[in-house]
């Protein structure tokens, strides 16, 4: 959109075409997505159709962000619709840049792709720091082709490789599907874990029957191998890919 323009180029082209064709009665709306490199999940796309069902939908809107300045953003549809192919397993891994989480998940994609008949898809998120920053790995695998060009928001398995994310209140367990698995790599006892988990996370775990596991890969890695290798084994085992 050019500064001072009434709309985006495509919106203006369509509006001009409709007007010249005498079709002014057609309701025309225009929206933006991908602003700030933000992901566009299915819940945002469903929000567009929900908006179009109104008698007077917004002429201009944005999706994928929360616009509290111009208030043009559409609220995402909740709960998020499930659009993945039936039988697809979705996993999400929260790591620390440089801890090997991304490398381990790339290895997992190779193992699953080379040694099973399953389809596999992987996306990786980094922040600007890269090393020492937050990384999120998104893995999908299943028996049917995977056509999900967006990040995972409702996972069967979520792993937190850095316990500081729990103490900082990162919303990780909220990405687990009801009945799914949430795993934390930490050195805490049960009492310490109960102290570090905030009330919102505890309520979500209880209300959605989340299976909570802890693994002390930190101490084990000192004795045996890297943290990422141990957690990679755990994630593959919990997904029933290891026999």
Predicted regions: what they are:
Residues 2-83, 214-224, 229-243:
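Peripheral docking tails and interdomain loops at the edges
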Residues 1-8, 12, 16, 21, ...:
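Active-site cofactor/cluster-binding pocket
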């Amino acid at each position: 959109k050019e500064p001072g323009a009434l709309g985006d180029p495509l919106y203006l082209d369509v509006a001009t075409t409709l007007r010249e064709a005498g079709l002014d009665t057609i309701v025309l709306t225009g929206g933006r997505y991908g602003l700030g490199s933000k992901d566009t999940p299915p819940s945002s796309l469903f929000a567009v159709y929900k908006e179009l069902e109104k008698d007077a939908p917004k002429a201009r809107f944005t999706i994928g962000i929360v616009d509290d300045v111009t208030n043009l953003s559409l609220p995402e549809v909740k709960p998020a619709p499930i659009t993945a192919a039936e039988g697809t397993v979705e996993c999400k891994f929260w790591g620390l840049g440089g801890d090997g989480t991304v490398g381990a998940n790339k290895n997992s994609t190779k193992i699953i792709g080379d040694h099973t008949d399953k389809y596999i898809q992987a996306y990786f998120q980094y922040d600007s720091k890269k090393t020492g920053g937050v990384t999120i790995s998104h893995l999908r695998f299943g028996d049917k082709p995977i056509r999900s060009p967006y990040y995972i928001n409702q996972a069967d398995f979520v792993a937190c490789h850095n316990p500081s994310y729990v103490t900082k209140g990162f919303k990780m367990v909220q990405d687990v599907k009801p009945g799914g698995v949430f795993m934390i790599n930490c050195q805490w006892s049960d009492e310490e874990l109960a102290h570090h988990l905030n009330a919102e996370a505890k309520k979500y775990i209880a209300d959605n029957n989340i299976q909570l596991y802890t693994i002390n890969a930190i101490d084990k890695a000192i004795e045996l191998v890297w943290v990422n290798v141990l957690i990679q084994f755990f994630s593959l085992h919990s997904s029933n890919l290891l026999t």
